[in-house]
Amino acid sequence: MVKQQDWSVTTCVLLFLFLASQIHCRSGIHVSKRLEGSKQGDGKSGDTSFNVLRRVLSPKEKDLIKKLPGQPSGVSFRQYGGYVPVNEPSSRFLYYYFVEAIKPNTSTPLVIWFNGGPACSSLGGAFLELGPFRVHSGGRKLFRNPYSWNNEANVLFLESPVTTGFSYSSNPIDLEELGEKGDKATAEDNYIFLMNWLERFPEYKGRDIYIAGQSYAGHYVPQLAQIIIHRNKKTLVNLRGILIGNPSLLTSIQDPYGYEFMLSHGLMSQQQMDNYNQFCLRDDLYDNDKCALSVKTIDDAKKHLDTYNIYAPVCLNSTLSRISKKCTTVLEVDPCSKDYLKAYLNRKKVQKAIHANTTKLPYEWTSCNNELTENWSENDRDTPMIPILHELMGEGVRVMIYNGDVDLEIPFASTLAVVKEMNLTVVKEFRPWFTGGQLGGFTEDYKGNLTFVTVKGAGHSVPTDQPIHALNIFTSFIRNTPLPHTA
């Protein structure tokens, strides 16, 4: 009797297991078919009773650029691009493009780069100057820049202020106030961006950080550095130094050097200079009509010049070529390269790849927002940066100011005059420095960790005109080593 009961129990258990396995098998087939159907995408509404769980990507992971359209092979470093909000509630968004160092480690510094303007895109800095790629003449393919600054650092390119490049605001009030509060608002937005970006990329919080830029970034860079210093007790940022090229620092001193530069480079006559001095500068002989005529005569000579590099050719035909030019090299400046970049960044495929223009802005990407540039506060433009530079140096922040020697917009002599206005003690006298045995320019060191550097054969955008010199200057600065003083 007991054996019969045991057999009955055993039979029931086996029968239960058999039925359960059949149910599981059928269920598995059903699920498999659903998955297969969803992959095939027959266009019909699917069965929503089955949901595949997916891991939610972090903002950093979403910003990862898998590959740039037209990117050459052999790229080993990671790239990111995306938007970071800079106010609450979020209406202002700054766009960034970030390239990790080619050979990164946990101590590789972070460099933040700004172009000037005001309101010129730092993507110009990325793809025309110091980034890892340049754009071919067809506006579709890229080629490598072997002298990219990510040979030495992780480089973050920030499009600032808002409405520059892909950066935007959804609040019209922001745009109305920006022209009036340009410098102050921009510095605040840049700081908030950095704080929010470091939350997205926390591995860089303890890194050495440098801020760099050119032209009107002579305002952006010191002003952002000043905010960092003022707020470092609350949120520590390991700011080590600032590097500014051909910078706007003090217009009252720098502006008059333009005509002197033209005269010394054979771009105007001595008589034209004498007329200008007589009718425009002397109170006893000032004549408004004659002054205006004098200025017009001189300025007419600029029409056929690239004032950012007086020895560079000008772009005569920016028509994109179907076949990219052969033997393209960063050592040859193509005067139409801005047009190639504009065509490249306005391709929908490119914007999707770099996570830009996600809100479908009603205008195309341009290298500068000319409307904002023209409406920028004159008071801001004329504000001297000397007091901020003194403050930063007093806090132990190293400063390097470099200037191309063929820039008419901000001549090197005008920048040197600003440095002299700072009344610093010279530690090492004006002397030559070299790259590969060739003269790279001249340099002078001052007490308080300020270095001034001229760059031979470079204009307003030093990394474009002299990429090897620019990389050597940058490397020297972040390694805190002197530029080579022997050939």
Curated annotation (Swiss-Prot):
The active site is at residues 215, 407, 460. It is an enzyme of class 3 (hydrolase). Its main location: secreted. InterPro entries: AB_hydrolase_fold, Peptidase_S10, Ser_caboxypep_his_AS. The lineage of its organism: Eukaryota, Viridiplantae, Streptophyta, Embryophyta, Tracheophyta. GO terms for cellular component: extracellular region. Gene3D superfamilies: 3.40.50.11320, 6.10.250.940, alpha/beta hydrolase (3.40.50.1820). It is found in: Secreted. Disulfide bonds join 120-368, 280-291, 315-336. One of its GO terms (molecular function) is serine-type carboxypeptidase activity. Belongs to the peptidase S10 family. The keyword Glycoprotein applies. The keyword Secreted applies. It comes from the Eukaryota. Glycans are attached at residues 105, 317, 357, 375, 423, 449. Expressed in seedlings, roots, leaves, stems, flowers and siliques. GO terms for biological process: proteolysis. The gene is SCPL37. Keywords: Carboxypeptidase, Disulfide bond, Glycoprotein, Hydrolase, Protease, Secreted, Signal. This is Serine carboxypeptidase-like 37.
